[in-house]
Amino acid sequence: MFYNYLIVFGLGVYDLPKSIDGLMRYMRVEKHISIAGSAQKRKLRNMGYYHGYKGYRFIGKSSNSIPYTDFKELVAIYDFDMRLKSLLYPQLMFIETALKNYVLEEILKESNSDNFNYIYTKLLTDYTRFTPGSDKQKNAIKQRLAVRDRVYSALTREYGNKKEVVQHFYHKDTSVPIWAIFEVLTLGEFGNFYSCLNYGVRRAVSIKLGFHQPSDSDAFLTKKIIFAIKELRNAVAHNDVIFDTRFSRSSIDKSLSSSLEIVTRIKNITFKSITDYII
């Protein structure tokens, strides 16, 4: 059964169960969208009323509605969005894996160890660049402590999920190596980890990735890329709408846009269009 808010009693709004035929009638009568026949009924059922019609009835925000007159128009946008996700998903997975591997290589080279506690002590030291006791250093220390907590939370989570690579080391009563930790960190968790690395490791990663060095004076361009694609990656993985970049809930650092404009010679990269992410 499908549901739609149709009846209001007093101050409350109640869900009224609707059949697929009832929802098609609602779209015709209330929304003035031409929809009929078994083929379109099947398409609406496959899309899902909420994920399909409700999700694709606007651009960016619900107040910016699309004036559909025919169900075929909605299907065209839905199909475009689905194909876009199919195109981007393998690329996003490749980027995530590559970034983790580049960072892992430099961490192992710098520390000569795969032990998380040792790496945490020796390399996650970005906080030391701030004046001792200053607000900036306190915030950096809080972030560093939060990263440690997130790593152990991720290991607990994945052990509970019976992740083989995690269970293997715990059952052997040995510490989980950094490469295995990277396998279970989400992209956001990885971004927070990277943010705490010292300048030397960050600079080495930036050079290895071939970034435009004058645009990466603080060696944080990698972090900015991680967080720029994190929300898109999550939206694609969860099959959310992406064509209008509604997934973006945080502003993209302007220095990332500037760097991309220099390298690509494409102007006005704002990440307000999905094409900017493809660049």
Can you say where each PLM-predicted feature lies in the sequence?
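Acidic/aromatic/glycine-rich contiguous surface patches that form carbohydrate-binding/processing clefts
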Residues: N239
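Extended intrinsically disordered or low-complexity regions, especially N/C-terminal cytosolic tails and loops
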Residues: M1-E231, F243-I279
